[in-house]
Amino acid sequence: QMCIRDSNNEAGVRMEFYEDGDEIVSIWKPRPEYQGWIDTLHGGIQAVLLDEICAWVVLRKLQTTGVTSKMETRYRKSVDTKDSHVVLRAAIKEIKRNIVIIEAKLYNKDNEVCTEAVCTYFTFSQEKAKSEMHFLYCDVEPEEILPLI
């Protein structure tokens, strides 16, 4: 089996992931139900998006599973829920044994950095991921079908 997100979850954020060199990328459409203030994407939703893309860095780049042990988030600019899309990008910054530091950024439709996160992930060995979490491998969408914006 490969990594699968549950697109049938009505409450889910429904992200899709692509590989772009060392980065994992997601292009996501804000929805009005995720606003915290009028036409403003809730900060908690932004944190969910950033945490999720960091998890996919672990899944895809390291081919294992892990859990978030710490997340530092910096909100720089509000995100408009009426925007056509936002872009999230994340990559590994550092690996210390089973601890992985991942940097992620959320950009608005004008390619301005709105939110940044540094996630610290505790990762499991591939053996444990396979035996206890039933994780075999993770594919992302091919880079050649990365949507053009």
Q: Positions of the model-derived regions?
A:
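Hydrophobic beta-strand-centered segment that forms part of the acyl-chain substrate-binding groove
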Residues: 53-87, 92
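Short amphipathic beta-strand and strand-loop transition segments with alternating hydrophobic
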Residues: 15-18, 92
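Residue-level recognition of well-ordered beta-strand positions that form the cores
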Residues: 27-29, 72-74, 89-91, 105, ...
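A generic structural signal for short beta-strands and their flanking turns/coil linkers
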Residues: 11-13, 22-24, 44, 67-71, ...
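Short, small-residue-biased leader/transition segments that mark boundaries at the very start
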Residues: 2-4
